[in-house]
Amino acid sequence: MISKQKGTYDLYGEEARKVLALRNIFENIMNNFNYSFIRTPVFESTELFKRTSGETSDVVSKEMYEFKDKKDRSLALRPEGTASVARCFIENKLYTDLPRKFWYFEPMYRYDRPQKGRYREHFQFGCEAYGSNDARVDAEIISIPYHLFETLGLEGVKVRINTLGDNESRENYKKALVDYLKPHIDSLCEDCKERFNKNPLRILDCKVDKDNEILKNIPKTIDYLNEESKTFFDEVLSYLDSLEICYEVDPKTIRGLDYYTHTVFEIEANIKDFGAQNVLCAGGRYNNLVENLDGPATPAVGFGLGSERLLLALEHENIDIALTKSVDVYVIPMTSDKSFSFSLVYLLRTLGLSVETDYLNRKLANNFKYAEKINAKYTVVIGEDEIEKEYFTVKNMKTREEEKVSKNEFLKYILEHLEQDDCSCSCDCGEDDCDKGCDCHDCSCF
């Protein structure tokens, strides 16, 4: 038997419904914020990620899936979404009409050690906003996942935020960091010794040296900001205050990719015994990225979050977002010739109903059991007698009531009853068993 590859998973059934529900919630939020959907290829030129993430980053040096195609071109499976969207932005000259705001939900690939909530193929929600240096856009980007997590019912949602400042501030900090680390370089891991010479900021994101006492007392980026960068960061915080978003300025929040400038952030939730996976989202501003890819200088800010980790957090907190799947009508053919019932199933589906039928030639009792299993609202039995006398036997699976409905009245009957079942309006007569179609029923549905 051929099995799935390590670090991947099959998605079906209840888990698939959760993913679709989460995607729908995210899409609705993105529509409210006026972001447009974007999709980029799963594989790109390897050079794209080397130029954006940085050759010394863990993503490029350790985790990226690289391969050669039949013409010996170096390609890579997309490890993150921001670089691909930036490439699309430049290649299609989207910079001619700014601002641009995008969202995506796409698979990403990293050769990492698989663990619960972390896979080699994982799906990422992301947002990218191009064209504005306004601090409100940073606050808007942060507010999107913050709002998502609160909407889902997670508690203790908090933003950890820091700033790298502009290019000048970043260079000032890099020099201070090198001066601080130089006497202690022998105490760093082998990777960090290499990073020290190529990109010392990478050391701050090291997983091996995270508990190293030397790194606990490193200089803070905020102390090396020029006035312009400090003012910008203060504006971002002010806008977060105006949105009543809970945040903490955390000097240790440093993103591990080369393209970040100014704002960097992570968002976590208070999930008991969830450990490091409390961090559910990360992002920041990257004003140099488009220009570094040979496009025109364009400010941008964005974030990414993994759906698997978020779904695991929801499961951990006993939050179920999957809608109960139900079927409007289950058609039970009890004739040798199934063509009439098969045509009816198709007709009902074209009218927008969720419809299933029996393809296994079950006995009548077993069909009713299956109808219960799939949460069918109504069953329709079509036997020889029904065809001869031109009526259907319709059963309400909730009340267990059966009615014989004439063939000519069936469509009107089933559509009206399904609509009444979905109605949640009040009734003035005060009777529990009041017909929702009665005159005293205060309903705008009919």
Indicate where each model-derived feature is located:
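TRNA-recognition modules of translation machinery and tRNA-sensing kinases, especially anticodon-binding
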Residues: 1-429, 438-446
